[in-house]
Amino acid sequence: MKIELSVQPWDPGYSSEGATAQETYTCPKMIEIEQAEAQLSELDLLASMFPGENELIVNDQLAVAELKDCIEKKTMEGRSSKVYFTINMNLDVSEEKMAMFSLACILPFKYPAVLPEITVRSALLSRSQQTQLNTDLTAFLQKHCHGDVCILNATEWVREHASGYVSRDTSSSPTTGNTVQSVDLIFTRLWIYSHHIYNKCKRKNILEWAKELSLSGFSMPGKPGVVCVEGPQSACEEFWSRLRKLNWKRILIRHQEDIPFDGTNDEMERQRKFSIFEEKVFIVNGARGNHMDFGQLYQFLNTKGCGDVFQMFFGVEGQ
């Protein structure tokens, strides 16, 4: 929304009969709302363009809920999280083979005035190939899409150019399962937020299901409750499917990480932040048992290299 102002230059000898100079002033608040509306519209468009299961994964559902709420209230106050989603595309890399390419997309608050943060990954790409692909994609977006929504442009660019970054040796190597197997070549880490976790049966289920599915991570009972599981994508999806069917006041995936890997056990173990799955209880001295010490939680996450997740969960920086 632009507000046109007619301004007459101040001059003692200036006559009002003369021409007026015009300035254009854009209200910062309206710019923020328009940017938020553009983000939501693009997300709706992407949902229609990628309707298949696991084609479009909203990694941070709460961020989208915050975005919608801010648009409805016409204010960006209270918005704490960036919209974060992943687009998975199965692309032809040779005449005989398809491979999954994942675009992890984070939309800054000022997007589309600034470029999105996009990282393309595939199990077929070496580290240097992946770096070069992402560098070239960023250069393309800077040249052609600055100031406009551009996620679809990014997907089309990857669709057209991805095969050129896969080495001939890699693309010609034998494989089995193609698309079906590619799902299991994703290492997933789910960060689950619950209004509270008190019930002993639920806590027991969480521990038993994680063990059954060979997932590592932790659960923190109390109010709020936190659960993190990591392992093969299919196992994490099964865990979430079981968990969400229980009776909860509120539960959601607050953050999701999807990391392509080569499918070997050694590589999977290297991706893990946690060696086992355990229940962690961080009790505040002198407080009721259902209130946890978030300072201890933050320190625990920091030791695991996950300190940045704290702000995603609670909207404040950990201490």
Curated annotation (Swiss-Prot):
Q: Is the Phosphoprotein keyword given for this protein?
A: yes
CDD domains assigned to the protein according to its UniProt record, in alphabetical order: RWD_RWDD2, RWDD2_C
Domain of life where this protein originates: Eukaryota
Family matches, as InterPro entries: Phi-like, Prp3_C, RWD_dom, UBQ-conjugating_enzyme/RWD
Record's keyword annotation contains Cell membrane: no
All copies of the RWD domain together span 41-165
Which PROSITE patterns does the entry mention?
A: RWD (PS50908)
Where Phosphoserine occurs along the chain? 275
**Keywords in UniProt for this one?**
Phosphoprotein
Q: What is this protein called?
A: RWD domain-containing protein 2B
Gene transcribed to yield this protein: RWDD2B
